Amino acid sequence: DLIPYLPVMAGVPLESASRYEQVQNDIRLTIEELVKEKFFQTFTRLAEEQYVEVSCAPIPRTDHPDDMFRAMSIAHIYNEHPVQAAVCTGNSGAWNGLPALLKPLVDRHLALGINRFIFQHDIVRHLEARGFMDYITMCQHYLQQGRPVVDIAVFHPSENPEQKNSYRAPRGYKYDLMNKDALLKWNFEYSPKGKLPGNQDYRILVVSQPDSIVIIDKPYQAKNFSQYGIDPDVILPENMDYAHRLVLEATGRKDIYFLINQENKERQITATFRTGTSRIRQIVNLNLPAYGSVFVILSNRDDMQIISPAKLLLP
């Protein structure tokens, strides 16, 4: 009965701190379940009856979840494809967001996992930015293929929303946030890896606590997970990031890596990739311009393509 605890909804503690938190958590979960069941599931069902897709914030019942990191995680877990987000949008400035200034931001979001950009129709000067739009289109073409390679699933309880930005995976690994709904659907017996309804494989499950992340032993202080047979997906220098897509074809697998230079200077780097199994490495030397990007495409036929999307679009 919630009536005796109505003051809790106004922030007034009752009985004890633990009891107060229990009631608050119950209220939050009830609201969450009602919003999902009574609104989103109903709205999505009505939309499907009219053959209309739904796009909104990251609720796992929509066709195109639209909110940064949670959207990416939910899209990966529930096999929603592609992952879209509104980009290059702001309330300040007077038409001074030149493509040269926006490209590092765009690359950063591509590396995070966004692979379809939504532009406000009255903000971006599309006609004056044809090359920029072509660059984004080419990147989206490659990054919408296959499925993302993400090694780590982090269980993030709904009652700790402010903690979602505090996770830092070891370098060379990507992670997704997993809520209770996804965790309950995790099928541990289906595969040695954790396989979810969207066929997304995770090799590590991290369960958060208020002051630590628990993985095998706590706190986990190693630089990587090699001792558990999971080497870094990519080894890169500082101030670089990546996205990795796995494409399974009739002729075998294809690994698409998107690498970005986040420094305003030209760099010569060595990138080491984990391909096929975690014990097979591919080492590639690359020359990246300031804020440059490159696709490295590897196949199990020992083929390798290096594609610089910006250079391909030069007149």
Where do the model's predicted regions map?
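Carbohydrate-binding surfaces of carbohydrate-active enzymes
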Residues: 1-315
